[in-house]
Curated annotation (Swiss-Prot):
Pathway given in the UniProt record: Amino-acid biosynthesis; L-histidine biosynthesis; L-histidine from 5-phospho-alpha-D-ribose 1-diphosphate: step 4/9
Stored InterPro entries: Aldolase_TIM, His_biosynth, HisA_bact_arch, Isoase_HisA-like, Isoase_HisA-like_bact, RibuloseP-bd_barrel
HAMAP family, per database record: HisA (MF_01014)
Protein name listed in UniProt: 1-(5-phosphoribosyl)-5-[(5-phosphoribosylamino)methylideneamino] imidazole-4-carboxamide isomerase
Family of the protein in this entry: Belongs to the HisA/HisF family.
Keyword Phosphoprotein: no
CDD domains recorded: HisA
NCBIfam families: 1-(5-phosphoribosyl)-5-[(5-phosphoribosylamino)methylideneamino]imidazole-4-carboxamide isomerase
Highest taxon listed in the record's lineage: Bacteria
Cellular compartments annotated: Cytoplasm
Organism from which the protein derives: Christiangramia forsetii (strain DSM 17595 / CGMCC 1.15422 / KT0803)
């Protein structure tokens, strides 16, 4: 199972939110590159980079930070937040993203999202399925949709989606443990999805449980920044896989 630390960006700084609420913003580091380099120094190969300014304004904003991290580390970066147009994707990929995550766009403009899958391939386009009470939330989680999470993912699997990041918003940033039951259900109701668990990771012992369920990756944010899990623990986990 891949270990994927998260860096969320607001105004160029590394922050975390609780349950996606921008009012709960806490700045952890002024320099996202420094954070990314510390991940790489501990054997981590992947990074989930979220442009929260972009998510709010519905277009790419913090691509210069993406470019800096891509140029100065070897991390494979999945970039998301406010990606709405082919131009946004072009900027993201040219700035060094290995993959992009589309969330709101997959709900609000499925034709565009499907076109991205055709154009760039399903290894580069990740479906962001962010759920609040089992309904998909959009626009930086500021709006709810009527899309139920399981049919939503099943529908996109039929359309060729391979990678899905699923965040249970009620868990995100709360350090109360992930949504094991939800992930178990998604994996039992889909055929070949590479499911990346996100939200609520609070301690190291949760990782083997997610791997056992069949999650292909796990995104960890606040547990790192609040020192609940050390980078050394990740390093050992990666070495022993």
């Amino acid at each position: 199972m891949r270990i994927i630390p998260a860096i969320d960006i607001i105004e160029g700084k590394c922050v975390r939110l609780s349950k996606g609420d921008y009012a709960t913003k806490k700045i952890y580091n002024e320099d996202p590159l420094e954070v990314a380099k510390s991940f790489e120094a501990h054997g981590i190969e992947y990074l989930h980079l979220v442009d929260l300014d972009g998510a709010k304004s519905s277009h790419i904003v913090n691509h210069k930070i993406l470019e800096t991290i891509a140029n100065k580390t070897s991390l494979k970066i999945d970039f998301g937040g406010g990606l709405k147009t082919d131009k946004d994707l072009q900027i993201a990929f040219e700035s060094g993203a290995s993959q992009i995550t589309g969330g709101s766009i997959a709900v609000k403009n499925s034709d565009v999202f499907q076109n991205w899958i055709q154009k760039f391939g399903n290894k580069k386009i990740i479906l962001g399925a962010d759920a609040k009470d089992r309904k998909i939330a959009v626009s930086g989680w500021l709006e709810d949709s009527n899309e139920e999470i399981i049919p939503f993912i099943q529908n996109y699997e039929e359309k060729g989606v391979k990678y899905v990041i699923c965040t249970d918003i009620s868990k995100d940033g709360m350090l109360e443990g992930p949504s094991f039951e939800l992930y178990k259900e998604i994996l039992s109701e889909t055929k070949n999805i590479n499911l990346i668990a996100s939200g609520g990771i609070s301690e190291f012992d949760e990782l083997p449980k997610l791997a056992e369920l069949g999650c292909e990756g796990v995104i960890i944010g606040k547990a790192i920044y609040e020192n609940r899990i050390s980078l050394k623990q990740f390093e050992n986990y990666i070495l022993n896989q």
